[in-house]
């Protein structure tokens, strides 16, 4: 009897690649990482870890037609605790992976960076920063 086991990283990566299957999401992340956006990677990190804590940043987000109150710092800490720094980090630290991109190109990133930006995009953190920066 042979069983196929999948690691947590493989499961997370599969889920992340499905999320980033829409090129616009990956492009949005890359613009920030490559310095082509009005906000920088450091600003996104600083907002999530410092500003949101000090100013208790809260706003409404819509999920499944319901409006929910989103507490940026509280949710950030919950994700960090659930995933650990290796799997939830805005910077390209730890083990790098190569993922396919458009026009037969690829990009190097980490699972942690992809996961952090998924959180930031899904919960309108990036949009909030852009609107208020």
Give names to the regions the model predicted:
Residues 1-88, 99, 111:
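Long, compositionally biased non-globular segments that serve regulatory/targeting/scaffolding roles
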Residues 88-89, 93-101, 105:
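IQ-motif-like calmodulin-binding regions
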Residues 122-133:
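Long, highly charged low-complexity segments enriched in Glu/Asp and Lys/Arg with interspersed Ser/Thr
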Residues 100-102, 111-113, 119:
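Alpha-helical bundle/repeat cores within regulatory domains of eukaryotic proteins
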Residues 76, 104-108, 117:
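Conserved aromatic-histidine-acidic binding/catalytic patches
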């Amino acid at each position: 009897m042979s069983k196929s086991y999948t690691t947590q990283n493989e499961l997370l990566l599969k889920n992340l690649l499905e999320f980033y299957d829409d090129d616009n999401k990956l492009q949005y992340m890359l613009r920030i990482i490559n310095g082509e956006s009005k906000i920088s990677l450091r600003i996104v990190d600083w907002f999530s870890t410092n500003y949101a804590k000090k100013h208790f940043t809260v706003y409404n987000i819509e999920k499944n037609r319901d409006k929910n109150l989103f507490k940026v710092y509280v949710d950030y800490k919950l994700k960090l605790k659930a995933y650990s720094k290796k799997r939830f980090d805005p910077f390209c630290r730890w083990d790098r992976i190569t993922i396919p991109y458009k026009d037969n190109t690829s990009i190097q990133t980490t699972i942690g960076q992809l996961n952090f930006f998924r959180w930031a995009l899904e919960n309108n953190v990036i949009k909030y920063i852009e609107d208020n920066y």
